[in-house]
A protein has these predicted regions:
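Conserved PLP-anchoring active-site segment centered on the Schiff-base-forming lysine
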Residues: 106-125
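Conserved coil-to-alpha-helix start sites within the AMP-binding
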Residues: 96-100, 117-120
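Short glycine-rich anion-binding loops that position phosphate/pyrophosphate groups of nucleotides
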Residues: 39, 97, 168-171
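Active-site phosphate-binding strand-loop segment of PLP-dependent enzymes
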Residues: 137-171
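N-terminal small-domain helix-loop-helix segment of the aminotransferase-like
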Residues: 2-3, 7-94
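Short beta->alpha connector loops at strand-helix junctions that form conserved
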Residues: 115, 134-139
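A short helix-loop-beta submotif of the ANL/AMP-binding
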Residues: 127-132
């Protein structure tokens, strides 16, 4: 019933490790989790109060996210990055993993993926049926690909579209 592309995917190693550590905790083992993306910080009280104040809201939101929130994000990033970001180019989503997946499914071309990288990016590219071009990064370059390395990939075929997944840290 499932497409072969789904059947061939391996389980996420981070989710598997989290599952094993949870089982060990149930058995009484003391586990220190350093890798799972769960925030160790409490949700700020202002956010908790706003969520309470808006709990009655049950309508679908605009696809790009709330206009006021997008404007606030654009203004904040514009201030931090000394570049004028437009709220029309800001998308608010349910999480970065979902947005990265959607981007790769919609993108027609090859994905340039620095290595090491987060475990989800390559499977997302595979599900999007995109070819992956991996660039091995080094400590000397702060785990970022160099301009020359990126250029080398692109010059192999200038007629293709390329999407470079670049974030810091490379997760």
């Amino acid at each position: 019933m499932l497409k072969n592309i789904i059947k061939d995917l391996k389980p996420s190693s981070t989710l598997k490790i989290n599952e094993i550590s949870r089982e060990l905790e149930i058995k009484g083992e003391k586990i220190f989790k350093f890798g799972f993306g769960q925030s160790p910080f409490q949700v700020p009280l202002d956010i908790v109060n706003e969520l309470k104040n808006n709990a009655h809201q049950n309508k679908y939101l605009p696809m790009q996210g709330l206009k006021e929130l997008r404007e606030t994000v654009a203004k904040y990033v514009s201030t931090k990055k000394d570049y004028n970001y437009n709220s029309k180019n800001v998308i608010i989503g349910p999480g970065s993993k979902e947005l990265m997946f959607l981007l790769q499914v919609l993108f027609e071309g090859e994905i340039i993926l620095p290595a090491p990288s987060w475990v989800s990016y390559a499977p997302q590219a595979i599900l999007g049926r995109n070819k992956i071009q991996t660039i091995q990064t080094t400590r000397e370059n702060n785990w970022f690909p160099t301009g020359a390395e990126i250029e080398q990939v692109i010059l192999k075929n200038k007629k293709k579209n390329y999407l470079l997944i670049l974030n810091s840290p490379n997760n």
